[in-house]
Amino acid sequence: MTIKAEEISALLKERIASYGSEIEVSETGTVIQVGDGIARAHGLDNVMAGELVEFSNGVMGLAQNLEEGNVGIIILGDYKGIKEGDSVKRTGRIMEVPVGEALLGRVVNPLGQPIDGLGPIVTDTYNPIERKAYGVMARKSVHEPLQTGIKAIDALVPIGRGQRELIIGDRQTGKTSVAIDTIINQKEENMICIYVAIGQKESTVRGVVETLRQNGALDYTIVVSASASQPAPLLYLAPFAGVSMGEYFMDRGQHVLVVYDDLSKQAAAYRELSLLLRRPPGREAYPGDVFYLHSRLLERAAKLNDELGGGSLTALPFIETQASDISAYIPTNVISITDGQIFLQSDLFFSGVRPAINAGLSVSRVGGSAQVKAMKKVAGTLRLDLASYRELEAFAQFGSDLDKATQSKLNRGQRTVEVLKQDLNAPLSVDKQVIIIYALTKGHLDDIPVTDIRRFETEMNAWLDQNRKDLCREIRQTGNLPSDEAMVDAITEFKKTFSPSV
């Protein structure tokens, strides 16, 4: 066997030519302390605030505290596998979540990973979780209604697309039910819904998902769940992940509804992280920037101008109060950030008024201009009527002999309360709402016994579907109130067929 020197030298030259001498440089630090979802690392001198870092076991973290000599990192996942002395390296990226159509109908965690057992989510689009809110000139005033399907809200505290309406109340007063009914009612409205569950029991989230599925609402909904058993960093990030997923659709000219259930648990998780990071505590031990935490989240809700596609993102944040105290720190913060609030009262809830909306303390600051014209006309006096009824009701308990005017106000008030009651998961279309409230305010229900009001409404809705489809269609399509003759004619025609209980 002969060895040819030319072949060997040619082969060596080829190998040398293809040799790459690129050096991969990554800044690496060492974990010096770990526990409770927090790690401190030494050696990441150039890391930036909010930058994503990677631990040696593959778990990611977010750099939060940039101190002299060490960096405070919140760990996004299980911190049990990280120990003192492990390496941690910079990624040079900020945190992003997967977004897009592929997430619709899925249940994901705040990192965008599926937790519903239905396989991987295939999308190549990612959005950063923190983004600057749109400026004043990029926005348009709120002018389109968001129909919740709940009479008490659409009549008394209307919500517009792009608005931020706080839902506030004690635990077990029906806050989540209001949100679920609103999501179910968007079926015909071509709206994307995102339900963010923060610190909820996993069984509760499962119940919500099943309710949405049974009502055909899961097809246009994304559920982001950070359950109570998950570490505080994930509870803190969940709302930001939800709004980032929503912004993808808003930027494409679509309408989005994001429900944050609830932000008091996010504030508690943020307080926990801040105290572990040794940030100075303020009122109620919350850090000084807890207001900024919620304001930068809720400011991302917007109604965009036509040049940017005219999309909208409506936010329904929840706050849980303790013993109906809306003057506590977090409730007052969020009330001052939002465009109004719906206050659910436990006394009303337990007395059978459901949804338990306190009309006196609830307000919508911008929704009035977005209300359907027909509803605006018929529900104009409803709030005042209800307020004067509540006032008279308190006095009426002391004396029995009341003058005629007071008695008629009390009678009308009782019927108003009955009309505004509604069953669970039974949102009502705007035309049916307008007709029953018209019947109420014009006195057509004054001769119907209070106990029959709910039955009267149910039977009238069925009768209207059979005999007055054109009337309902006119209200739905034009948003205007038909002539008084047409309305009175429909109501009196139905009343002839209605038999009150003896």
From Swiss-Prot:
Known catalytic reactions: ATP + H2O + 4 H(+)(in) = ADP + phosphate + 5 H(+)(out)
Compartments where located: Cell membrane
Signal sequence bounds: none
Protein name: ATP synthase subunit alpha
CDD domains assigned to the protein according to its UniProt record, in alphabetical order: ATP-synt_F1_alpha_C, ATP-synt_F1_alpha_N, F1-ATPase_alpha_CD
InterPro entries on file: ATP_synth_asu-like_sf, ATP_synth_asu_C, ATP_synth_asu_C_sf, ATP_synth_F1_a_nt-bd_dom, ATP_synth_F1_asu, ATPase_a/bsu_AS, ATPase_F1/V1/A1_a/bsu_N, ATPase_F1/V1/A1_a/bsu_N_sf
GO molecular function: ADP binding; ATP binding; proton-transporting ATP synthase activity, rotational mechanism
Main location per the UniProt record: membrane
Source taxon at top rank: Bacteria
Keywords from the UniProt entry: ATP synthesis, ATP-binding, Cell membrane, CF(1), Hydrogen ion transport, Ion transport, Membrane, Nucleotide-binding, Translocase, Transport
Membrane topology (UniProt): Peripheral membrane protein
GO CC annotation: plasma membrane; proton-transporting ATP synthase complex
Matching HAMAP family: ATP_synth_alpha_bact
Gene from which the chain derives: atpA
Marked site (Required for activity) residue numbers: 362
